[in-house]
Amino acid sequence: CCTPFYFCCNN
């Protein structure tokens, strides 16, 4: 999962 901006989940 990732946000459409910057941060991404550690998935």
From Swiss-Prot:
This is Conotoxin Ama1309. GO terms for cellular component: extracellular region. GO terms for molecular function: ion channel regulator activity; toxin activity. Contains 2 disulfide bonds that can be either 'C1-C3, C2-C4' or 'C1-C4, C2-C3', since these disulfide connectivities have been observed for conotoxins with cysteine framework V (for examples, see AC P0DQQ7 and AC P81755). Keywords: Amidation, Disulfide bond, Ion channel impairing toxin, Secreted, Toxin. Probable toxin that inhibits ion channels. The modification Asparagine amide is found at residue 11. Expressed by the venom duct. Its main location: secreted. The cysteine framework is V (CC-CC). It comes from the Eukaryota. It is found in: Secreted. It comes from Conus amadis.
